[in-house]
Structures are given as C-alpha cells and as structure tokens.
Amino acid sequence: MASGKGCFYANFKPDNGNYTKDGNLITSRVGIYSANSNGLYDMAGNVAEWTSTIYTEAGVEAMNDINPTLKYNAAQEDPYRLKRKSVRGGSWKDPESYIRSAWRTAEYQNQPRSYIGFRCVRSLANSTSERAKSTKGKRK
C-alpha cells in the first residue's frame, strides 16, 4: 500500500503488537509476574488457551442451562467443521487488544500451535472458605 499504513486483510494482525515490552523475547516462564487482585497468576498473554467447548459462530448465544459448555465429542466420520474447539485469550503473538479472556477464536482440535496452551484448574467448591482464603495469593 502506498500510504505505508498497511491493509487489515493483508497484514498479520489489525493492531500493533509490542512483543518485547516486558523484556521477554519468547514465551515467559510461568509465575514471573505478580498475582492479580484475586491471587491468580498469568491469566492472560503468554499463550491462548484451549477450552473443552466446541466452537460455533453463535458462540455464547447458543449456551444454555442444559448445555452450558457446548461439549461435543466429534466422531471420526463427522464433518471437519464439527471438530473445532474454542480458544480463549490472546498469546505472545497477538496485539494488546486480543489479550483478554473475552477474545475467542477457533482451532481444529488436532492442530497444535506454539501459541496455544492449556490451564490446569481445580475447583474450590468442596473446599472450606477458610482454606480458600488462606491460600489466596500464595503459589505452590
């Protein structure tokens, strides 16, 4: 493009990415940044995260109380479009505007990517509130 501003459809991403602002030239080690106000670490930016939820164009509009996570185990003979999973959040390769948990895209479940990871979680539903409070902000 003669103006030098580029073109949304021809360029890699629509915004500028500042990939080295934090001093890391590659993905960063888990836990090197401070916890957020909920005591959680590394909630956005290093890698986007696989979810167990299938990807549909309708997105969250298709969710309901009966099927809140839109799970579907695609069979070998199913169309390829049914084998997409939702990927949430941005990664090291994305511009700042994508680094939020509400950002959502799709990837085929059999396609590994260097910018997509997963998050190990555990439920505090069966824990006592005191135990949950005592571990807030502490790393194991």
PLM-predicted stretches and their roles:
Residues 1-100, 129-139:
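Functional-site microenvironments in short loops/helix caps that host divalent-cation chemistry
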Residues 51-54, 105, 124:
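Short beta-strand segments enriched in hydrophobic/aromatic residues
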Residues 74-79, 105-112:
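Short proline/glycine-enriched turn/loop segments at secondary-structure junctions
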Residues 22, 112-114:
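A short catalytic or substrate-binding loop motif that flags glycine-/basic-rich loops and adjacent residues
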Residues 65-66, 73, 111, 122-124:
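Short, intrinsically disordered/low-complexity patches at protein termini
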Residues 95, 107, 111, 126-129:
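Enrichment for repetitive, rod-forming helical segments
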Residues 114-130:
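Short, structured beta-strand segments at or near domain termini in extracellular proteins/domains
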